[in-house]
Amino acid sequence: MVIGRDRCYDIFRSNGLCQRTSRKRPKTTNSNHNYYIYPDLLNVAPKFVATRLGAMVVADITYVNTGQGWAYLSLLTDASSRAIVGYALYKTLETEGPLKALEMAISFYEKYHIDMSTLIHHSDRGVQYCSNKYVERLKEHQINISMTQCGDPLHLSLIHISEPTRLGMI
Protein backbone atom coordinates (compact mmCIF):
# COMPACT_ATOMS: atom_id res chain seq x y z
CA MET A 1 0.00 0.00 0.00
CA VAL A 2 1.32 3.45 -0.91
CA ILE A 3 0.03 6.61 0.79
CA GLY A 4 1.07 10.23 0.56
CA ARG A 5 2.81 12.27 3.22
CA ASP A 6 -0.31 14.26 4.15
CA ARG A 7 -2.42 11.11 4.57
CA CYS A 8 0.34 9.59 6.70
CA TYR A 9 0.34 12.66 8.97
CA ASP A 10 -3.46 12.51 9.19
CA ILE A 11 -3.25 8.90 10.38
CA PHE A 12 -0.52 9.74 12.90
CA ARG A 13 -2.44 12.75 14.20
CA SER A 14 -5.72 10.85 14.56
CA ASN A 15 -3.92 8.21 16.64
CA GLY A 16 -2.14 10.74 18.85
CA LEU A 17 1.30 9.95 17.48
CA CYS A 18 2.35 13.51 16.59
CA GLN A 19 3.78 16.06 18.94
CA ARG A 20 2.10 19.40 19.09
CA THR A 21 4.08 21.95 17.13
CA SER A 22 2.24 25.08 18.18
CA ARG A 23 4.39 25.84 21.22
CA LYS A 24 4.81 29.45 22.12
CA ARG A 25 8.35 30.65 21.72
CA PRO A 26 9.68 33.79 23.30
CA LYS A 27 10.50 36.78 21.16
CA THR A 28 14.13 37.88 21.36
CA THR A 29 14.18 41.01 19.20
CA ASN A 30 12.33 44.26 19.82
CA SER A 31 13.17 46.59 16.95
CA ASN A 32 10.33 48.98 17.77
CA HIS A 33 12.24 51.65 19.71
CA ASN A 34 13.48 55.22 19.35
CA TYR A 35 17.21 54.49 19.55
CA TYR A 36 19.50 55.18 16.61
CA ILE A 37 19.83 52.32 14.11
CA TYR A 38 23.42 52.07 12.87
CA PRO A 39 24.14 51.35 9.19
CA ASP A 40 24.88 47.86 7.92
CA LEU A 41 28.63 47.81 7.31
CA LEU A 42 28.44 44.34 5.76
CA ASN A 43 26.16 45.30 2.88
CA VAL A 44 28.80 47.22 1.00
CA ALA A 45 30.68 46.54 -2.19
CA PRO A 46 32.93 44.66 -2.13
CA LYS A 47 31.18 42.35 0.32
CA PHE A 48 32.85 42.34 3.75
CA VAL A 49 34.49 39.04 4.69
CA ALA A 50 36.14 38.48 8.07
CA THR A 51 39.56 37.03 7.28
CA ARG A 52 41.29 37.34 10.66
CA LEU A 53 40.54 37.05 14.35
CA GLY A 54 39.11 40.32 15.58
CA ALA A 55 37.78 41.55 12.23
CA MET A 56 34.11 41.08 13.12
CA VAL A 57 32.08 39.85 16.06
CA VAL A 58 28.43 38.86 15.59
CA ALA A 59 25.99 39.36 18.46
CA ASP A 60 22.68 37.58 18.92
CA ILE A 61 20.30 36.35 21.59
CA THR A 62 18.66 32.95 21.66
CA TYR A 63 16.37 31.35 24.21
CA VAL A 64 16.83 28.20 26.24
CA ASN A 65 14.14 26.22 28.04
CA THR A 66 15.56 25.62 31.51
CA GLY A 67 12.69 23.48 32.75
CA GLN A 68 11.73 26.37 35.03
CA GLY A 69 10.90 28.74 32.19
CA TRP A 70 12.77 30.51 29.44
CA ALA A 71 16.22 32.00 29.81
CA TYR A 72 17.99 34.17 27.26
CA LEU A 73 21.50 33.36 26.07
CA SER A 74 23.45 36.30 24.68
CA LEU A 75 26.27 35.23 22.38
CA LEU A 76 29.12 37.09 20.70
CA THR A 77 30.87 35.01 18.04
CA ASP A 78 34.09 35.95 16.28
CA ALA A 79 33.21 35.72 12.57
CA SER A 80 36.59 34.47 11.39
CA SER A 81 37.34 31.78 13.98
CA ARG A 82 33.66 31.11 14.87
CA ALA A 83 34.73 31.03 18.51
CA ILE A 84 32.23 32.23 21.07
CA VAL A 85 34.14 35.10 22.68
CA GLY A 86 31.35 36.28 24.98
CA TYR A 87 28.20 34.82 26.50
CA ALA A 88 25.71 35.42 29.29
CA LEU A 89 22.56 33.62 30.40
CA TYR A 90 19.81 35.77 31.94
CA LYS A 91 16.15 35.30 32.84
CA THR A 92 15.15 38.55 31.12
CA LEU A 93 15.84 40.31 27.84
CA GLU A 94 17.19 43.39 29.60
CA THR A 95 20.43 44.95 28.35
CA GLU A 96 22.47 43.48 31.23
CA GLY A 97 22.77 40.05 29.56
CA PRO A 98 24.16 41.27 26.23
CA LEU A 99 26.30 43.83 28.08
CA LYS A 100 27.88 41.10 30.22
CA ALA A 101 28.59 39.05 27.07
CA LEU A 102 30.13 42.15 25.48
CA GLU A 103 32.38 42.67 28.51
CA MET A 104 33.58 39.08 28.17
CA ALA A 105 34.32 39.58 24.46
CA ILE A 106 36.21 42.82 25.16
CA SER A 107 38.30 41.01 27.79
CA PHE A 108 39.03 38.25 25.28
CA TYR A 109 40.25 40.69 22.62
CA GLU A 110 42.29 42.65 25.19
CA LYS A 111 43.91 39.47 26.50
CA TYR A 112 45.15 38.61 23.00
CA HIS A 113 46.10 42.24 22.20
CA ILE A 114 43.66 42.53 19.31
CA ASP A 115 43.12 46.10 18.11
CA MET A 116 39.41 46.74 18.60
CA SER A 117 39.43 49.96 16.55
CA THR A 118 39.19 47.79 13.42
CA LEU A 119 36.63 45.40 14.94
CA ILE A 120 33.08 45.45 13.55
CA HIS A 121 30.31 44.54 16.00
CA HIS A 122 27.35 43.27 13.96
CA SER A 123 23.91 42.63 15.44
CA ASP A 124 20.22 42.88 14.73
CA ARG A 125 18.39 46.12 15.56
CA GLY A 126 17.16 44.90 18.94
CA VAL A 127 16.70 47.41 21.73
CA GLN A 128 19.49 45.78 23.77
CA TYR A 129 22.13 46.49 21.11
CA CYS A 130 20.86 50.04 20.45
CA SER A 131 20.63 51.02 24.12
CA ASN A 132 22.78 53.87 25.43
CA LYS A 133 24.73 51.61 27.82
CA TYR A 134 25.61 49.09 25.13
CA VAL A 135 26.54 51.64 22.46
CA GLU A 136 28.62 53.68 24.93
CA ARG A 137 30.63 50.58 25.81
CA LEU A 138 31.29 49.85 22.13
CA LYS A 139 32.36 53.45 21.51
CA GLU A 140 34.67 53.44 24.56
CA HIS A 141 36.69 50.75 22.77
CA GLN A 142 36.34 52.37 19.33
CA ILE A 143 34.44 49.32 18.07
CA ASN A 144 32.62 49.92 14.77
CA ILE A 145 28.87 49.34 15.03
CA SER A 146 26.91 47.55 12.29
CA MET A 147 23.26 46.46 12.32
CA THR A 148 21.11 44.46 9.94
CA GLN A 149 18.66 46.52 7.93
CA CYS A 150 15.06 45.57 7.18
CA GLY A 151 15.35 42.56 9.50
CA ASP A 152 17.67 40.63 7.17
CA PRO A 153 18.33 37.44 9.19
CA LEU A 154 20.98 36.14 6.79
CA HIS A 155 23.64 38.34 8.33
CA LEU A 156 23.20 36.69 11.70
CA SER A 157 23.23 33.18 10.23
CA LEU A 158 26.78 32.68 11.51
CA ILE A 159 25.38 32.22 14.99
CA HIS A 160 22.12 30.50 14.06
CA ILE A 161 23.79 27.82 11.94
CA SER A 162 26.36 26.85 14.55
CA GLU A 163 24.25 27.42 17.67
CA PRO A 164 22.93 23.86 18.24
CA THR A 165 26.39 22.35 17.75
CA ARG A 166 28.13 24.83 20.04
CA LEU A 167 25.53 24.37 22.75
CA GLY A 168 25.95 20.59 22.73
CA MET A 169 22.54 19.97 21.18
CA ILE A 170 23.80 17.91 18.25
Language-model features: locations:
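Two-metal-ion RNase H-like nuclease active-site motif
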Residues: 42, 54-64
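Short conserved beta-strand segments at catalytic cores or DNA/RNA-binding microdomains
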Residues: 61-94, 103
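RNase H-like polynucleotidyl transferase catalytic core
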Residues: 21-27, 120-125, 139-158
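Basic, flexible linker segments flanking DNA-binding modules
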Residues: 1-51, 152
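Active-site beta-loop-alpha junctions of metal-dependent nucleic acid enzymes
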Residues: 87-113, 130
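Single conserved hydrophobic/aromatic residue that forms the stacking wall/gate
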Residues: 159-170
